[in-house]
Amino acid sequence: MGQRDAKLLFHRLRCFLTGAFALAMWMSTGAQAFPGNASSLKKIRVDAQRRCFVTEDGKIFVPFGVNYFRPGTGWAPQVWKKFDATAVREDFRRMKAFGVNCVRVFLTFDSFYREPGRLETFGLDRWEEFLSIAEEYGIYVHPTGPDHWEGLPAWARRDTIADPQAVAALVEFWNLFAGRYRGRPVIFAYDLRNEPSVPWENSELARRWPDFLHRKYGSRQAMAKAWEVEITEEAWNKPQVPPLDGPQQAILDYQNLREEVADEWTRRQVEAIKSVDPEALVTVGLIQWSVPVLLPDLRTYSGFRPSRQGQFLDFLEVHFYPLARGFYEYRSEEDRLANLAYAESVVREVARPGRPVVVAEFGWYGGGKLTINNGRHPPASEEQQAAWCAELIAVTRGLACGWLNWGLYDHPEARDVTQLTGLFRVDGTPKAWAHKFHELSATITSSCCLQWAEWEQNHPRPAFDFDRAISDRNYASKFRQEYLKRFRAAK
């Protein structure tokens, strides 16, 4: 036998054995756990009516999955510094078997972007292996822009929302990163940042504040009339940050300045991504304080108003946790309804701009007792967790067209509710929520966002005055009371 014939025989034998092994795996684990391949993933787009996501061949796609990090990697999780390809592959096998089709994962400054203008090989090598595993299992990946989880270089420890040099560095990051992965279908969309928030007060905002007021009013007399207070020449030229008990119009103006900063931050990064990958989808992972239905303080409003952000983004994302009456402990039916009404009111406002909406973080604890807050919260069952998460999806369905649970696994190292929010226990066994998630995944993928106006017509709810909510400390609580009343009546 010649060398060429020997190689051909070996190749055929290898193909036969590979096929036999794959068949055995399919029979033993079920088709859902069988890996896909890169060619099975189609590029995701927003449909022409901006109601939902579709594949490039026109099929509806509903991102239904998890935020990915592993237990045993510390807190905050060291996703890339403790990257284990074997463990990641097992995680993807498990996710595929339970209906996950999309994972959101944090990129970090220390692993990917220690110096402005240069991507780190350390992070890129792990990222490319992560993408390859995702392609192998036919699961989309939703990367979130550089975060603090694995440490911050000195240049990124300053304000990276308003500081011009920091924003320029982020623009360059996206030029490099999005350009490198242009056209890679496995990447569902880019999330610019996890829960960005414009600072309440710093030197850059102080520099911009006089210019904002001068552009808006033109004269101190006009400003005095609007604020209904006397404005001195000094106050006109060097205005102070308004106190929270100050004139409502003054507070609103300052909040609008913060929104202007947020708009510029988003616009510049979106433009950077689109310049190197015009078909890439881009969003921002909004904290729930971006919709001021409930704010611990007017200063905690993020400045990222959904109706303003929507003009720059392909779709909108929001995160939600049940905090309507403090830390939700499953104690009463009234608490449950208050939190469901709160969730609906937040997602409703995010849907208002007419873009698809993904609830990119949600979930709550179950399957034990939390150790946080001196252990004061009562234990919760896995069934309570599963019921809450399923209800959250049900109440936002029709407004949202995607949901990503916070955590694949419980994470005992966490210093917050993440300790018990996973689909799976630390040992990899499925919780009640994993089984419910799997059940929902079989039907949720046909879901599609309704137009906001259509939903409004079918769900009579009180109008939300966004401007008052970010400038009047008493407005939001009254709104929530009225909203809950209407929500309860509809139930």
Task: Please provide the spans of the model-predicted regions.
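Aromatic-rich peripheral "rim/lid" segments of glycoside hydrolase catalytic domains that contact
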Residues: 369-491
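Active-site clefts of carbohydrate-active enzymes
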Residues: 245-253, 288-289, 319-334, 346-386, ...
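Bacterial N-terminal signal peptides that target proteins for export
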Residues: 2-17
